From Swiss-Prot:
This is Enoyl-[acyl-carrier-protein] reductase [NADH]. GO terms for molecular function: enoyl-[acyl-carrier-protein] reductase (NADH) activity; NAD binding; trans-2-enoyl-CoA reductase (NADH) activity. It catalyses: a 2,3-saturated acyl-[ACP] + NAD(+) = a (2E)-enoyl-[ACP] + NADH + H(+). The lineage of its organism: Bacteria, Pseudomonadati, Pseudomonadota, Betaproteobacteria, Burkholderiales. The gene is fabV. One of its GO terms (biological process) is fatty acid biosynthetic process.
């Protein structure tokens, strides 16, 4: 079938298998150009492995360090004439490329928050890897059903204590708009922490440790975004910020647990990129469009694979990791360059409907958004029929 992009709001409801595969190959090629990751991991578990930063971590570990990988994700398979999700096709392509290079790859498809998927993952580690020496936690989900209580918690993107008016882009109409966000209630804050805080990461590490599948010296990291002044009302000072602070508290306990066996636990702070999650946040399309404009002009723009490949080489396995005062690994240094942030702030209130394209890189933002779903990738013939029914080998469901 011929598949074209169909966008509804902040979601593209179609995906292109060949485009997703080409995107994965582009990321692999980037890692290969940078050469081997010295003293890198050899057996890696990535929780949230099918898109964005999690996929990039799996690619960097496998094709940079030669690691065997086990990926956990929650994706929809193709059915009848309906394509699967982008994460499904990304993972299928990853498996194909790994097999071609003789790299072990296993995947588990299901709810990472559940005890069932944790148990299935542990069984797969025992069977295929024995133990893992790196655990990457890269889960972004709007809701979580707690495995012990059965309660489903919904995350909320709101300020705390007062309403906030945010500038942003109505991406459907390509117009500047303002959104008034009311403050979160205490219950909404608690629910957001339950979904996006550190509890599930801790549950994963506790389960892996109790099962004996964490190697001595194992490391774990959870990915997060902090941002700067422009985004603080929504991120650090908002309901999501409370979840991020919970992540910072959680990592201290995990670090103590792993350090006893020569290991380590860190929160890794990554730069703002286009993801399905960030596209839904009212101010982020405008912020990203300005950030891309400024960083591309300076030659410092990076996407997921550049960020995570650099994180592994420079900090997780580098001799001189970039660590902040709170012990987090920082890969967002170029985004937070004072000159970059000052220029973004300078342009923020100047953007109008009339100058949206010349003043920002909204065109680049839109292109990156479509790339998430396999569209706009160089070398792909989007007028040619493509087979949507792609399977993932070594998949556990």
């Amino acid at each position: 079938m011929i598949i074209k992009p169909r966008v509804r709001g902040f979601i593209c409801v179609t995906t292109h298998p060949a485009g997703c595969a080409a995107s994965v190959r582009e990321q692999i090629a980037y890692v290969a150009r940078r050469g081997p990751i010295e003293r890198g991991p050899k057996k890696v578990l990535v929780i949230g492995a099918s898109t964005g930063y999690g996929l990039a971590a799996r690619i960097a570990a496998a094709f940079g360090a030669g690691a065997a990988t086990l990926g956990v994700f929650f994706e929809r398979a193709p059915a009848d004439a309906k394509p699967g999700t982008a994460g499904w096709y990304n993972s299928a392509a990853f498996h194909d490329e790994a097999a071609a290079r003789g790299l072990q790859a296993t995947s588990v498809n299901g709810d990472a928050f559940s005890d069932e998927i944790k148990h299935k993952t542990i069984d797969a580690i025992r069977r295929d890897l024995g133990q893992v020496d790196l655990v990457v936690y890269s889960v972004a989900a709007p809701r979580r059903t707690h495995p012990k209580t059965g309660v489903t918690h919904q995350s909320t993107l709101k300020p705390i204590g007062h309403a906030v008016r945010l500038r942003g882009i109505d991406t459907d109409n390509e117009a500047i708009k303002e959104t008034l966000l009311q403050p979160a209630t205490p219950d909404e804050i608690a629910d957001t922490v339950a979904v996006m805080g550190g509890e599930d990461w801790r549950m994963w590490i506790d389960a892996l440790d109790a099962a004996g599948v964490l190697a001595d010296g194992a490391k774990t990291t959870a990915f997060t975004y902090l941002g700067e002044q422009v985004t603080h009302d929504i991120y650090w000072n908002g309901s999501i910020g409370e979840a991020k602070k919970d992540l910072d508290r959680t990592v201290l306990a995990l670090r103590g647990k792993l350090a006893a066996r020569g290991g380590d636990a860190r929160v890794s702070v990554l730069k703002a990129v286009v993801t399905q999650a960030s596209s839904a946040i009212p101010m982020m399309p405008l912020y990203l469009s300005l950030l891309f404009k400024v960083m591309k002009a300076r030659g410092t723009h990076e996407g997921c694979i550049e960020q995570v490949d650099g994180l592994l080489r420079d900090s997780l396995y580098g001799a001189q990791p970039h660590v902040d005062a709170e012990g987090r690994l920082r890969a967002d240094r170029l985004e937070l360059d004072p000159a970059v942030q000052a220029r973004v702030l300078e342009l923020w209130d100047q953007v109008t409907d009339d100058n949206l394209y010349p003043l920002t890189d909204f065109a680049g933002y839109k292109a990156e958004f479509l790339r998430l779903f396999g569209f706009g990738i160089d070398g792909v013939d989007y007028d040619a029929p493509v087979e949507p029914n792609v399977r993932i080998p070594n998949l556990i469901e």
